[in-house]
């Protein structure tokens, strides 16, 4: 547990931008997940990439359905054991590997309870390294936008 009470990461993946999002959360209640989900959705809209389709596992299905319906976004829910269909599963692995490698390079005297303070740096460096699936001419624009997160 972090000093701010965070215990988990909410990790999301956007296919078009190939961006991975990670938000430290306190618990796995529906309300907490929908707040993190909304934060990711709003950030994508703010950057000009409005999601139109969402694939997710069955966690917090009712609130996510209601949210996506309000945003005119289609959705598909996959069973939790089917990791091949959900591209976010690979994004979770990628984020975990990147975060752990960065975490292991911290000072040996650094407080482990501050792990959630590394999130912004980890997400920024991870997304700068990823390739864009959209128009290659937008790469420099995307890099400038995502580094301002």
Label each PLM-derived region with a short phrase:
Residues 1-97, 132-149:
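Retroviral integrase
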Residues 94-106:
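A polyampholytic, Gly/Pro-enriched intrinsically disordered region
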Residues 104-149:
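Charged, gly/pro-enriched flexible loop segments at helix/strand junctions
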């Amino acid at each position: 547990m972090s000093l701010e009470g965070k215990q988990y990461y909410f990790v999301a993946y956007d296919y078009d931008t190939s961006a991975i999002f990670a938000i430290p959360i306190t618990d796995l209640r529906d309300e907490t997940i929908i707040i993190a989900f909304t934060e990711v959705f709003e950030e994508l809209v703010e950057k000009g990439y409005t999601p139109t389709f969402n694939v997710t596992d069955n966690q917090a299905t009712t609130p996510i359905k209601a949210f996506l319906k309000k945003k005119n976004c289609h959705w598909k829910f996959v069973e939790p054991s089917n990791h091949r269909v959900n591209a976010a599963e690979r994004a979770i692995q990628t984020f975990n590997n990147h975060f752990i490698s960065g975490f292991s390079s911290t000072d040996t005297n650094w407080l482990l309870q501050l792990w959630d303070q590394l999130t912004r740096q980890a997400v920024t460096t991870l997304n700068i390294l990823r390739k864009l699936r959209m128009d290659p001419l937008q790469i420099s624009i995307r890099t400038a936008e995502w580094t301002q997160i």
